[in-house]
Regions:
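N-terminal phosphate/diphosphate-binding loop that engages ATP/GTP or pyrophosphate donors
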Residues: 4, 18-93, 97, 102-104
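Hydrophobic anchor at the beta1->P-loop junction of P-loop NTPases
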Residues: 7-8
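Conserved glycine(s) of the Walker
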Residues: 14-15
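Switch II (G3) loop of P-loop NTPases
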Residues: 99, 103-126
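Inter-motif core of Ras-like GTPase G domains
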Residues: 126-149
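Charged helix-capping and loop-helix junction motifs
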Residues: 127-133, 157-160, 185-190
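C-terminal lobe/tail of nucleotide-utilizing enzymes
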Residues: 161-229
Length: 229
């Protein structure tokens, strides 16, 4: 059976792509067929006649099924701005039903499908829908990435509230230590655990830029426990 996960974050730049790639790389090395998808990407450069985005490139690099780089993204725009604005500039309508079909097509090609959102939970993707609406339509468990920067407690609390209100299942959260220059780091992380109601399923360390392998083993067991079917 294929397991699918939707990765969102507290904001842009919190480390969603890095977390996706860490999970793909580790579980792919365990013999699983894995693919990372970025249905919507904004901020792309034109190279050799094709739009290329750094996040899309990394997700493709860490996927191990036979696909082309452009296959992992359904909508890509050159402008580095909110997708509803980028799509309007390019006269392209982003349709969530089309994205759902795009994602579902990969379920027959891999054991694990990781879908990376764009920006945060309430980023508009068209005139009527936000990232959260796409996640609801996909109806797959959500992983929330939280970076340990100033303001993360407020960001985490608001995003958690919105995720739970949407009715999707929160599979777990990831602490991404993007900096080691934070006042009272231990107290901040303890506060995050209190807000989230659990310890993170993964902690990405600033110095090592990788998670503890033992955490990946726990994550693998959680993913394949089928507890969220």
């Amino acid at each position: 059976m294929t397991i699918s996960l939707f990765v969102t974050g507290t904001d842009t730049g919190c480390g969603k792509t890095f977390v996706c790639c860490e999970i793909l790389n580790h579980l792919g090395s365990q013999g699983l067929d894995v693919v990372g998808l970025k249905p919507i990407a904004s901020g792309a450069d034109l190279k050799n006649g094709c739009l290329q985005n750094d996040d899309v490139k990394l997700l493709h690099k860490n996927s191990n099924i036979d696909i082309k780089e452009h296959d992992v993204c359904r909508y890509i725009f050159p402008e580095p701005c909110s997708p509803h604005i980028a799509s309007s500039i390019n006269n392209t309508a982003i349709e969530t039903d089309e994205i759902c079909k795009f994602v579902n097509d990969f379920k027959n090609k891999s054991d694990l499908v990781i879908v990376e959102g764009i920006g945060g939970w309430h980023v508009p993707i068209n005139s009527e829908e936000m990232v959260c609406d796409l996640a609801v339509k996909l109806d797959i468990p959500v992983i929330l990435v939280i970076s340990n920067k100033l303001g993360c407690l407020n960001h985490a609390s608001l995003t958690l509230e919105a995720i739970l209100k949407s009715g999707v299942q929160l599979f777990g959260w990831v602490l991404n230590r993007i900096t080691n220059d934070i006042v009272a780091a231990g107290a901040v992380e303890s506060s995050l655990e209190k807000i989230m109601g659990s310890a993170p399923v993964l902690t990405i360390d600033f110095d090592h830029q990788s998670a503890d392998p033992m955490q990946f083993e726990v994550l693998k067991k959680l993913v394949w426990s089928n507890s969220f079917d």
